[in-house]
């Protein structure tokens, strides 16, 4: 019999071939492509959650970007979350079915709990009566006891992370900040056994594919070996034609390959995705490929055509390269164009001058971006749009990207004005492009679009920098991602700065600020990062024809070191030293070009390109504006209000020590800002997600300006440091960051002391008080005030008619004990009078006070209260 035919037989036959036996012996987990997205549910600090479906069954799919975790030095937390959920088999903990991954993302496929989270329920109720609060706290206490007995500390306990099942019972979720003391990789026996239950329920049985997915490596240190092609060969093929341009890579797809363009694009994409999955050297490996995409889009000659390339840029924008498969199969030729179109549309949303288009349509753009068409066939307006689209993929510094002209496609750096003119033309067309593409978005929704970063309109409305024409930009955003778009912009703005870091080796910040004058009205008050980035952007672009000087973006070599961006000038600009997460930046040699930028920086060009008129609205060089310093100092104040507002919207955060501050320069008084919530990170840090800092750049340039660096910042003579992701040993827990949500942090965490399971019991006490009163006990206007209230144990007990019962107040007291060694635990709660009527053994079988009544099985309305309270408009993002 033909061996091929034998291999197609169902495994299990008596005469099974070798291939059939292998299939039986090594079952495979499902691919993420087998899950279809139904709707978004919510989003948190470190990922987004979607309602997915496979085989008629609904799942909650949490999507976490690997690049985010690498840059935030939190890859171990993703592993900890997966391990904690995989090891947990308790009726009060969310069940994890699969742990899947692509080159760029980790997907945790969990059970979907239709009742929403307790935070949403609390928003609806206002507060819970004592009986209801006791039942919820009792179930959470059982969950914590289970976790602690198995060496797991949740460390992010709050109502947001308590989900309500169909029967109304509580299940803990979101172990993204958990600590697992297993000190080894979990194995099959850990997954198969059920130590928590004498008689394991069928609910906790797992298929071989599920078990394999839960014990598999998450691929942070090794490439994903799931491609049919050898990534090294593909990359070498990509690099084989690099000699035609200095400092650049031309597109390996020529006009003669038009018939295989979609396939070639897939190969190239596969190459980049595979390289992107190896964070051993995330900066070096990933960004060399970004240059390829830049050259394909921006520097190909008219004879070699302009090629659209499915690069890591697209993967970063949408994070799930595989989930576009359905669209590609339905229209193979359109597939690459669609993915590039998404990036173009995203760029359109970020355009500075989003004016309604009349002379350009989707067909023109697709024609221009198609690898088999000559861009010169487009009308002038179309060429301008394509020009900016290409610059979206560009990896060079701002002036090089802006100078590109599709009509004169070359690397001449003397065409900057023409580039600016074309950017303006693109801005004229941007609104129409977004509208034109709405039809294309109507194709089957799938997880390809999952990782587009949404933003909040309320934050967008605060971003009124002059280089953005606010009203038009808002309209363009509305077309793409409703409600959450500004977050992308704000993230970009930090990325904005990271590109300035690429300018760093060529343009000195001191000279930049000295040489240019910025009018006070150009500096928007709410966003520090935006203002700083805008100024740097203008400096770089305005000096495009000048000799490039050196700049100083200093980076850290130590796990606890801070990243400082010192900007000093003769005119007493305040020095700015901003605390940053260690792995947010990978140090680069001062002579390295944009090729060495980070994974996130494939999108850095967006903020630079979409502000072409920034230069036009800037005062002439050399004229020092005395109001600049005042304006900049004003910029350093309001973000505290912004951060305060954000803290009230979303509680999931990763904090640095609250004594982090902005160091003073040698010319001005220090401006101090404590690093606050991850919300601040979301709106002002890098594109990859939310960095644990308020206003840092992602880029990381070693500098030749020692007078601007702090003592522990640079180790001279060491151009690189070993990435933390490849260092052996357990990752340090106390790395200078305070992980958690301000209102629920235990004192020992704030004081930087060693902590254990007691931090969860403290958080449980906070939750009990919040259930009974509707507000956390230490809540205040700013995180710093919250921290002070925690350390002082300043609890505002209700009085009069609202007074809590003595038992309730006593229970809160014993849980909120400053001394963690005297803090109550499970034993103390069981003996406490408040819980005297609780049947601890049969709690999961008791009738709960609230039972969800959804309209249908895909109803997510019970999550809306929290989303609304935290200004998360998730119903339309990623559409």
Curated annotation (Swiss-Prot):
GO terms for molecular function: ATP binding; kinase activity; protein phosphatase 2A binding; protein serine kinase activity; protein serine/threonine kinase activity; transmembrane transporter binding. InterPro entries: AGC-kinase_C, Kinase-like_dom_sf, MASTL_STKc, Prot_kinase_dom, Ser/Thr_kinase_AS, Ser_Thr_kinase_AGC. Residues 589-598 have a biased composition (Basic and acidic residues). It catalyses: L-seryl-[protein] + ATP = O-phospho-L-seryl-[protein] + ADP + H(+); L-threonyl-[protein] + ATP = O-phospho-L-threonyl-[protein] + ADP + H(+). The active site is at 156 (proton acceptor). Phosphorylation at Thr-741 by CDK1 during M phase activates its kinase activity. Maximum phosphorylation occurs in prometaphase. ATP binds at residues 41-49, 62. The keyword Nucleotide-binding applies. It is an enzyme of class 2 (transferase). The modification N-acetylmethionine is found at residue 1. The modification Phosphothreonine is found at residues 207, 222, 519, 722, 741. Keywords: Acetylation, ATP-binding, Cell cycle, Cell division, Cytoplasm, Cytoskeleton, Disease variant, Kinase, Mitosis, Nucleotide-binding, Nucleus, Phosphoprotein, Serine/threonine-protein kinase, Transferase. Residues 1-23, 566-632, 700-728 are annotated as: Disordered. Changing residue 72 to M: Hyperactive form. It comes from the Eukaryota. Reduced levels of MASTL by RNAi causes mitotic abnormalities that consist of delay in G(2) phase and slow chromosome condensation. Cells that enter and progress through mitosis often fail to completely separate their sister chromatids in anaphase leading to the formation of 4N G(1) cells subsequent to failure of cytokinesis. Belongs to the protein kinase superfamily. AGC Ser/Thr protein kinase family. This is Serine/threonine-protein kinase greatwall. It comes from Homo sapiens. The gene is MASTL.
């Amino acid at each position: 019999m033909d061996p091929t035919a034998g291999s197609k037989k169902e495994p299990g036959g008596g005469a099974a071939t070798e291939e059939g036996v292998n299939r039986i012996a090594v079952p495979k987990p499902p691919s993420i492509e087998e899950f279809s997205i139904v709707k978004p549910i919510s989003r948190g600090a470190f990922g987004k959650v979607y309602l997915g479906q496979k085989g008629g069954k609904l799942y909650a799919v949490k999507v976490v970007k690997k690049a985010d975790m690498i840059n935030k030095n939190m890859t171990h937390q993703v592993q900890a979350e997966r391990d904690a959920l995989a090891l947990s088999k308790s009726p009060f903990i969310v069940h994890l079915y699969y742990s899947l991954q692509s080159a760029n993302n980790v997907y945790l496929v969990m059970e979907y709990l239709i009742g929403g989270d307790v935070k949403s329920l609390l928003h609806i109720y206002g507060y819970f009566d004592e009986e209801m609060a006791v039942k919820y706290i009792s179930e959470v206490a059982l969950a914590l006891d289970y976790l602690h007995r198995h060496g797991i500390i949740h460390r992010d306990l709050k109502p947001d992370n308590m989900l309500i099942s169909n029967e109304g019972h509580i299940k803990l979720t979101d172990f993204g900040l958990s600590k697992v003391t297993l000190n080894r990789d979990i194995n099959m026996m850990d997954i198969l056994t059920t130590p928590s239950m004498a008689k394991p329920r069928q609910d906790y049985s797992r298929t071989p594919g599920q078990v394999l997915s839960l014990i598999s490596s998450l691929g942070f240190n090794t490439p994903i070996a799931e491609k049919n092609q050898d990534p090294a060969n593909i990359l070498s093929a990509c690099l084989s034609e690099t000699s035609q341009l200095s400092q650049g890579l031309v597109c390996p797809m020529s006009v003669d390959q038009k018939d295989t363009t979609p396939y070639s694009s897939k190969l190239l994409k596969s190459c980049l995705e595979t390289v992107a999955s190896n964070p051993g050297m995330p900066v070096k490996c990933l960004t060399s490929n970004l240059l390829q995409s830049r050259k394909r889009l921006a520097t190909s000659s008219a004879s070699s055509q302009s090629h659209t390339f499915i690069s890591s840029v697209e993967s970063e924008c949408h994070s799930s390269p595989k989930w576009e498969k359905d669209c590609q199969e339905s229209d193979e030729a359109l597939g690459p164009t669609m993915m590039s179109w998404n990036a173009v549309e995203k760029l359109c949303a970020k355009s500075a001058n989003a004016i309604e288009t009349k002379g350009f349509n989707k067909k023109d753009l697709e024609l221009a971006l198609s690898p088999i068409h000559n861009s010169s066939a487009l009308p002038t307006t179309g060429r301008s749009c394509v020009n900016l689209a290409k610059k979206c993929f560009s990896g060079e510094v701002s002036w090089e990207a802006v100078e590109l002209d599709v009509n004169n496609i070359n690397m001449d750096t003397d065409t900057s004005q023409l580039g600016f003119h074309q950017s303006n033309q693109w801005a004229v067309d941007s609104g129409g492009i977004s509208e034109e593409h709405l039809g294309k978005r109507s194709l089957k929704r799938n997880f390809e679009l999952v990782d587009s970063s949404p933003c909040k309109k309320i934050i967008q409305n605060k971003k009124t920098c002059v280089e953005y024409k606010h009203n038009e930009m808002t309209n363009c955003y509305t077309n793409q991602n409703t409600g959450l778009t500004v977050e992308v912009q704000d993230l970009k703005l930090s990325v904005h700065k990271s590109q300035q870091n690429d300018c760093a080796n060529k343009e000195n910040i001191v000279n930049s600020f000295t040489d240019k004058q910025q009018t006070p009205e150009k500096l928007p008050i709410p966003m520090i990062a935006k203002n700083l980035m805008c100024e740097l952007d203008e400096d770089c672009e305005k000096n495009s024809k000048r000799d490039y000087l050196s700049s100083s973006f200093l980076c850290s070599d130590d796990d606890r070191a801070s990243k400082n961006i010192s900007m000093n000038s003769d005119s007493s600009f305040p020095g700015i030293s901003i605390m940053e997460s260690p792995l947010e930046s990978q140090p680069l040699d001062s002579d390295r070009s944009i090729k060495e930028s980070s994974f996130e920086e494939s999108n850095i060009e967006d903020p630079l390109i979409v502000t072409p008129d920034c230069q036009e609205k800037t005062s002439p060089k050399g004229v020092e504006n005395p109001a600049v310093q005042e304006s900049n100092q004003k910029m350093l104040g309001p973000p505290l209000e912004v951060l305060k507002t954000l803290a009230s919207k979303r509680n999931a955060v990763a904090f640095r020590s609250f004594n982090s501050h902005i160091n003073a320069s040698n010319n001005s008084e220090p401006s101090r800002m404590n690093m606050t919530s991850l919300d601040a990170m979301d709106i002002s840090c890098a594109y990859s997600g939310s960095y644990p800092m308020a206003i840092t750049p992602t880029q990381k340039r070693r500098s030749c300006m020692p007078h601007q660096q702090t003592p522990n910042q640079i180790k001279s003579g060491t151009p690189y440091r070993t990435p933390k992701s490849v260092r052996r040993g357990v990752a340090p827990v106390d790395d200078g960051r305070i992980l958690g949500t301000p209102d629920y942090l235990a004192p020992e965490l704030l004081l930087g002391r060693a902590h254990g399971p007691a931090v969860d019991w403290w958080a449980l006490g906070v939750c009990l008080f919040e259930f009974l009163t509707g507000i956390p006990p230490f809540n205040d206007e700013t995180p710093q005030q919250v921290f002070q209230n925690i350390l002082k144990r300043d609890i505002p007990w209700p009085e009069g008619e609202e007074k809590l019962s003595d038992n309730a107040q006593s229970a809160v007291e014993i849980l909120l004990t400053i001394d963690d060694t005297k803090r109550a635990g499970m034993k103390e709660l069981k003996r406490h009078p408040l819980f005297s009527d609780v049947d601890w053994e049969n709690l999961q079988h008791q009738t709960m006070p609230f039972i969800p009544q959804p309209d249908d099985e895909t109803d997510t309305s019970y999550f809306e209260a929290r989303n609304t309270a935290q200004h998360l408009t998730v119903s339309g993002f990623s559409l």
